[in-house]
């Protein structure tokens, strides 16, 4: 086992002349290596690939191998986003003081000004994105890590005030290590100053769009970076308030790799969308178009309760009367309809959104806790008209249903919906809701996060939103989970959809202690579109092609679209006070009771 352990090692000795000769050969080899100019190649921090610098620039400074987004300077970012020759820089001549007389600060600023050719850590100005004018700010992390001192705070505030004065949207690209320590309390106060300016911008009804880039941290995160109407982010960007190492030291735990990254914030409800840098220009352009305040004058006339079959678009089915549709709908039993709308073949909210609207862009998150995938929502065009679209989304197989929580929204879903609806009011966009849920999500977590409060806030908020709202039950309309999206000026149901206080199974279980009597429960609950129109709970029934929307989803979409166009055209002509009064009276009038007169009451006593 120990054989040879203490055996003497044999060495080869070289005379001094030979050593000198070998060193000379090594030096010659080094001098013969090809010289590579500085800046010719770049190394990816993520996958360690070596990339030709010119190729990297052509690819928007995105690694060809792994998609890693390199950090870029403010001027480079502006050049990537705006139309050529449209940039007009604002406030070029504001430069930093040294308010605390901090040793070496002024010299450091001077040095960085020469090195970066920037005067401060942000550029602001006016520019066009695909022809659309905006105020744009871009931070540069090369300049004192993009930290916010008096100059950065002032330039951000002036940019926002320019947006207010010129009636323009404001777009801010953030890249910052946070507050500028060398300016002390002056730096801290910039957080309040910039946030107050954004409040004034929002009062004016102008869009504020933020793009979070790597890194966005500290005081910038805790002020103007997280106050956007729409918050976008580049992939894998570091975004957070406290540093990861500080948190780990405090809680004595190792945090996951994805912690404080863009995708982490998307999952937790604080980012609307993560967008590849190559797509950023067109996405921003699209969002700006969706926020134009002037509505298009051209609106197509809707053809009420008629449809074009996608199988034979040249043949238009004759419009049927309300009574014909009502009688046709009675051919199936209530529980037959329950089973029909639960079919995995039934068109979902996203199916209708894709068929009816143009340019739908989905936004995520409740800005409090998470994004709920059982509710989808965002902006789109309806025949050129910007609208807010929200839908409860089920899955078609087990995996998708698990991802969508079986179409049963949690509090985050309802809070996301109300956030999008409040934005619709701010920017004067009609709201269209697609309802399809067996009910709100129930569970320990949902209750801990306030499911009841979330639904209540939706009902409260929707009752007074100053824009038209149309809600359409396309499948199941289950209890408060459905009602949370149906406080609307018009409530419609597809011919075979159902809308109820609880599922038939739940009704039978509660009242008869036997969930197997669901069919009998459905018969007495008055849950069909035909029942609810007779009870004056809903406003309209939309005929399903071939008496089943799943047989021709495209035709069903055309019916919905025609009705939406016609109704929105009518609703948009109403004065706001009239719209709100009629919405209030609509729900105020619902209820059945007997009220005895004072005389009857005294006799009974």
Curated annotation (Swiss-Prot):
Name the PROSITE patterns for this protein: COA_CT_CTER, COA_CT_NTER
Q: Name one Pfam family in it.
A: Zn_ribbon_ACC
> Which GO terms of the cellular component aspect does the record hold?
acetyl-CoA carboxylase complex
| Keyword Lipid biosynthesis annotated | yes
Which reaction equations make up its catalytic activity? N(6)-carboxybiotinyl-L-lysyl-[protein] + acetyl-CoA = N(6)-biotinyl-L-lysyl-[protein] + malonyl-CoA
Q: What is its EC number?
A: 2.1.3.15
Name the Gene Ontology biological process terms: fatty acid biosynthetic process; malonyl-CoA biosynthetic process
Q: Which domain of life is it from?
A: Bacteria
Which residue intervals make up region (Acetyl-coenzyme A carboxylase carboxyl transferase subunit alpha)? 270-593
Q: Which GO terms describe its molecular function?
A: acetyl-CoA carboxylase activity; ATP binding; carboxyl- or carbamoyltransferase activity; zinc ion binding
What binding details are noted for the cofactor?
A: Binds 1 zinc ion per subunit.
Where the protein is mainly located, per its record?
cytoplasm
Q: Where in the cell is it found?
A: Cytoplasm
Q: InterPro entries annotated for this entry?
A: Acetyl_CoA_COase_a_su, Acetyl_CoA_COase_Trfase_b_su, ClpP/crotonase-like_dom_sf, COA_CT_C, COA_CT_N, Znf-ACC
Under the heading HAMAP family, the entry gives:
AcetylCoA_CT_alpha (MF_00823), AcetylCoA_CT_beta (MF_01395)
Quaternary context: Acetyl-CoA carboxylase is a heterotetramer composed of biotin carboxyl carrier protein (AccB), biotin carboxylase (AccC) and two subunits of ACCase subunit beta/alpha.
Cited function: Component of the acetyl coenzyme A carboxylase (ACC) complex. Biotin carboxylase (BC) catalyzes the carboxylation of biotin on its carrier protein (BCCP) and then the CO(2) group is transferred by the transcarboxylase to acetyl-CoA to form malonyl-CoA.
Task: Provide the family line.
Answer: In the N-terminal section; belongs to the AccD/PCCB family. In the C-terminal section; belongs to the AccA family.
Name this protein carries in UniProt: Acetyl-coenzyme A carboxylase carboxyl transferase subunits beta/alpha
Source organism per UniProt: Natranaerobius thermophilus (strain ATCC BAA-1301 / DSM 18059 / JW/NM-WN-LF)
Give the taxonomic lineage as stored in the record. Bacteria, Bacillati, Bacillota, Clostridia, Natranaerobiales
Q: Which gene encodes it?
A: accD
